[in-house]
């Protein structure tokens, strides 16, 4: 067993990728060895300098990967993000500070590049707060009891003059990216997708080693013929003992840029013959789905959890990138144990724009950089955090001022796992 000081944390070379991938699979409790085809598919994600490994001798025992991403702020502003993924530490090498070393190295490089934030989807809640991340969006999954929903079983087409067609993977790759761009530029919390995302999700590339099964793809066009919505879903072909259909339609993803498209796609999914249950996939916690049904109680929440975590790397640029419905000012003291963006900042904000600059004035509101991340996209409440003792008012009423500036009328949402 090597001494802890001998474990080397560094960017991997392309030649080390197979060993890095073995360590990644081990950390995720998957079979360590994979077929050569799957390994080659995973190489598509390799970017020199952005995949880190911890090496005990010549064996990789921890993994970390990041890549360039854009995140949509409140109001539609796009900020540069360092997306963190593939974080593992082999069970034999835990509690040695390997993740801390990899995270520090990556965040320092992201700060140097000029990234405004870092992002990740946290597998475990208690890990990432220590690095300045905070839960900035959440997600909800619903299961719809179709017979109870109250929709007309004779439904055959959208009432608005639009239409729904079933398409194939080539159509999804052709039409999906532009549709997603329209959605994500209007949806705070949404992130950019690469061409690889679409190739992975339509079976062009085998990225997880499982046999590819083609899903169904439903496309919504408005009465004017414009593509405004798309969904990918699978059915399970399940029947009961009395020869009654008990099928479930599970949604992989659903994109809609208008309420009409969203309504039409959900109504279509809930009208498929033999389908008794529709599982929604990852949706916004204030998604319209339940209220698109005559009986909203037919949509039962099955999962509700934090989703996208954000680590602010530049307080001023992050706060200036978003819009504000209210008018006001507040002096924030941001505590950053990572030393990347702490300090005291005066935020002056209103509907016409915002400025955020360092100040020597007395603080009105003191908070950790992770809690600022939770507030930044508007999903969390400063008053709520104050009640929990996680933030501190230095001026009475400061939490209400922060909420008046940062809270939003619709909640942020990230549709993606990465």
Swiss-Prot record:
Residues 7-158 form the N-acetyltransferase domain. The keyword Nucleotide-binding does not apply. Acetyl-CoA binds at residues 87-89, 95-100. Its EC number is 2.3.1.-. GO terms for molecular function: aminoglycoside N-acetyltransferase activity. Keywords: Acyltransferase, Transferase. It is an enzyme of class 2 (transferase). The active site is at residues 128, 418. InterPro entries: Acetyltransf_17, Acetyltransferase_Eis, Acyl_CoA_acyltransferase, Eis_dom, GNAT_dom, NAcTrfase_Eis, SCP2_sterol-bd_dom_sf. Homohexamer; trimer of dimers. PANTHER family: N-ACETYLTRANSFERASE EIS (PTHR37817:SF1). This is Uncharacterized N-acetyltransferase SCO4186.
